[in-house]
């Protein structure tokens, strides 16, 4: 099968790290990038240098109005309206929508006007079908033109929840994600009309926040619909987050059996998506980890045979972007 040719709309944290993952894996070929707020020279600089993931090891240059990475030319567009981006002129059949702005079927489908065959939204969507690699890809229908890769937190939680529900059954559960700082937060206190706490300085505070990640699991695993909800704490770290899933199980069990089930999944059907560790790890140990979710066996606790707290780490930038690449490649293989 030919390598899928892809365009990226939005060259922010996810857009740039998706491009790094595309180059490193070779699963997709990025042929065009659109961002109305970043000119070509600045685009090259932002891709080459990264405070979290380090300097890009290959060559990065600009030539003839194009971004050239490791000798591969990428067309650059600066359109504000997605409908005006001529993806077909660059040969891009699939578009990764990573602005964080066009997250509905209607708005994201504007890319189809420029010649895209399918749009993959790198964020949760209110109405586009959501897919989590390792969890519900078998539900994908090639007729779907706009799909979502869900959120980084849903990608961490869903594989873990699937293993636990399939093996022991989940009656109900609460999730907390202790989440690294993201670009929407403020460096110092500033206005944030809809979320007053979210306007407080990111580096000075632990900030309680809402998240739809747990409820979204019910969309990708229908058996868990209405059984999970959750919240977030935004913390002053640059990257890597951790999910705390506390559940009431349908079947009584012990923690050793829970560990064994997750370990088996991590070495079998969810290999590469769900990781497993018994080491005494901390957040920075997972920076640049390709997994969606890495279960921390020594961090979880059990109160009773049916009540347990499970802990799983994720690089909310790198691991998620790796899955975006996987999802694009998978959907292209079905066309």
From Swiss-Prot:
The pathway this protein participates in, as annotated, is: Carbohydrate degradation; glycolysis; pyruvate from D-glyceraldehyde 3-phosphate: step 1/5
Site described as Activates thiol group during catalysis, located at: 179
Instruction: Give this protein's Gene Ontology molecular function annotations.
Output: glyceraldehyde-3-phosphate dehydrogenase (NAD+) (phosphorylating) activity; NAD binding; NADP binding
SUPFAM superfamilies cross-referenced by the UniProt entry? Glyceraldehyde-3-phosphate dehydrogenase-like, C-terminal domain (SSF55347), NAD(P)-binding Rossmann-fold domains (SSF51735)
Quickly give the catalysed reaction. Answer: D-glyceraldehyde 3-phosphate + phosphate + NAD(+) = (2R)-3-phospho-glyceroyl phosphate + NADH + H(+)
Chain positions found as Phosphoserine: 125, 151, 192, 203, 209, 241
Catalytic residues as annotated in Swiss-Prot or TrEMBL: 152
Q: Name one GO biological process term.
A: glycolytic process
Query: Pfam families, from UniProt?
Result: Gp_dh_C, Gp_dh_N
UniProt binding sites for NAD(+): 13-14, 35, 80, 316
Q: Which family does it belong to?
A: Belongs to the glyceraldehyde-3-phosphate dehydrogenase family.
| Complex formation | Homotetramer.
Give the protein name, as stated in the record.
Glyceraldehyde-3-phosphate dehydrogenase 2
